[in-house]
């Protein structure tokens, strides 16, 4: 219906898809920087959220009934912060700087979760809030950066390829996490349930 409406308005028809569009996109270095940031960023967040409640119980001694509350701060924060950071990007630009700040925050968060310090619930909460800032900051600058390096007629293909790369990461990283946990982090079995030493 939308295409018919656009045709009725007399707008130029879109150019048909061509295989050389893919070649153009995958030979663009900027595309690969954004695609790799996307796969690394989302692979460091989404699989982490899957294991975060168990991390809260095992490492930070959070009551299992409340263990999902701390990781639950992440999407709540994203609802509030992502539009604010998007507005900031629209006003000042500086997409590469914003993405770099968010990526450094993400590295800091995972480093703090990995170090054996301050194994208390309030520390985990603060670190999760910092992760919420990173989780909002990077995408609000990353997705609008794609049209700056890819022509409009190839944007659909570029976004599809970015999601294709991202899904490879989202498939592989949980397997890697599970392998690491089973190989190096197994604790004792308690009440018939395997525990892990984070």
Name these PLM-found stretches.
Residues 53, 85, 173-181:
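Small-residue (Gly/Pro/Ala) motifs that create kinks and tight helix-helix packing interfaces
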Residues 64-65, 152-162:
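Loop-to-transmembrane helix entry/capping segments in MFS-fold secondary transporters
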Residues 81-94, 181:
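Helix-to-loop junctions at the C-terminal end of transmembrane segments
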Residues 77-81, 165, 169:
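MFS transmembrane alpha-helix packing/gate-lining sites
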Residues 28-79, 139, 143, 173-174:
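Extracytoplasmic gate region of multi-pass secondary transporters
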Residues 179-198:
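A membrane-interface helix-boundary motif in multi-pass transporters
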Residues 95-145:
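C-terminal transmembrane helical hairpin of 12-TM major facilitator-type secondary transporters
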Residues 2-33:
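Juxtamembrane intracellular "pre-TM" segments in multi-pass secondary transporters
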């Amino acid at each position: 219906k939308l295409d018919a409406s656009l045709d009725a308005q007399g707008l130029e028809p879109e150019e048909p898809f061509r295989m050389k569009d893919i070649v153009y996109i995958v030979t663009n270095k900027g595309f690969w920087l954004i695609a790799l940031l996307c796969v690394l960023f989302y692979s460091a967040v989404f699989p982490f959220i899957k294991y975060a409640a168990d991390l809260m119980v095992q490492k930070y001694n959070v009551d299992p009934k409340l263990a999902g509350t701390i990781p639950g701060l992440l999407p709540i924060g994203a609802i509030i912060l992502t539009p604010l950071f998007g507005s900031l990007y629209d006003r000042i630009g500086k997409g590469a700087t914003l993405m770099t700040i968010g990526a450094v925050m993400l590295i800091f968060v995972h480093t703090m979760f990995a170090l054996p310090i301050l194994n208390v619930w309030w520390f985990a909460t603060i670190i999760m809030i910092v992760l919420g800032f990173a989780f909002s900051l990077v995408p609000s600058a990353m997705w609008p950066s794609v049209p700056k390096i890819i022509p409009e007629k190839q944007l659909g293909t570029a976004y599809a390829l970015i999601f294709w790369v991202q899904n490879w990461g989202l498939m592989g990283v949980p397997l890697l996490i599970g392998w690491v946990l089973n190989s190096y982090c197994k604790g004792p079995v308690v009440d018939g349930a395997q525990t892990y030493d984070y």
